Amino acid sequence: MLVMLMMEELLTTRELAELLRLNEKKVYQLIKEGGIPHVRITGKWLFPKWHVLRWIDERVEREENILIAGSDDILLGRLLASYSRERFPKSVIFYSPVGSLKGIQCLSEHKAQACCLHLLDVETGEYNLPFLERHLSSQEYIVINLWHRKQGLILKRNNPLGIKGLDDMVRRKARFVNRNKGSGTRLFLEYLLSQKEFHETEIVGFTDEVDTHLEVGLRVLFGEVDVGLGIEYVSHLLSLDFIPLQEERFDLVIPKELWPIRVMKEFVGSIDPANIRRLARSLPGYSLKDTGKVLFKS
């Protein structure tokens, strides 16, 4: 058995914590209580990646875990961390920030049990629902609002280029960092460009992509670019300038068939305005006016 495990890719405790998006202390608790596949070699805990992924799938099938795929969001990360602290290791929620469109795809292919998204439909001006109608037409689902958040331009402190909006950014050839294809932020940028009748080739750095809002902010902070598109909180965290462009709706989508399972009901119960207000206390740029509201049932 040990020889077979050695032939697999083995993860360290830190690598496993990053994969599961957990604190390293939680990994040791999983070893003790959760039965996660592991082996100890020369005094170090190692984890066979294939067996770990299969262990996750089995727990999902037993309705002990759920996987949420979709958009990157800092407040959602806080909510999931808070949930896990209270219920770990009885149930764990895994979070894969692959982008809004990829999240819908994961849900439609039954690779995830929920998805989170912020997709602006350019024809209707509506968030999320038109995309769900197109991509989940054969499934029944429930849409819950998590929160609204401000999206805009993240700029160097004191805005040395004097950028006031997208027009200035393009005309002054400011160095830009983009988000990954399929993310709601990327689609929002493409919508803005179409409204202004700019072409993507006019943006310096349009093909320079990162996966998260924080990465956008860090690229600006380190002087690698002049501007990026992201949420207000990142600019606050890194003491950067921010020009708001849009308040967007950030929703959670759950298949109807999974609504009754214990871990899903517990998680939905945690989407309580009072609880979210506590978690969002130090996060500017968020509005909880519709938090927890069921927006749609198919």
Model-derived segments and spans:
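A ligand-binding cleft/hinge motif common to bilobed small-molecule-binding domains
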Residues: 118-132, 217-246
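Periplasmic-binding protein-like
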Residues: 9, 143-150, 236-269, 290-291, ...
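Short beta-strand-to-loop elements that line the ligand-binding cleft
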Residues: 92-99, 200-213
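Short helix-loop capping/hinge motifs at secondary-structure junctions, enriched
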Residues: 157-164, 198-199, 257-263
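Short beta-strand-centered segments that line the small-molecule binding cleft or hinge
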Residues: 103-150, 220
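Short loop->beta-strand "edge-of-pocket" segments that line small-molecule binding or catalytic clefts
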Residues: 64-72, 167-187
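Flexible hinge/capping segments at coil-to-helix
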Residues: 146, 155-176
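N-terminal hydrophobic or amphipathic helices and topogenic motifs
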Residues: 1-102, 111, 135-141, 166, ...
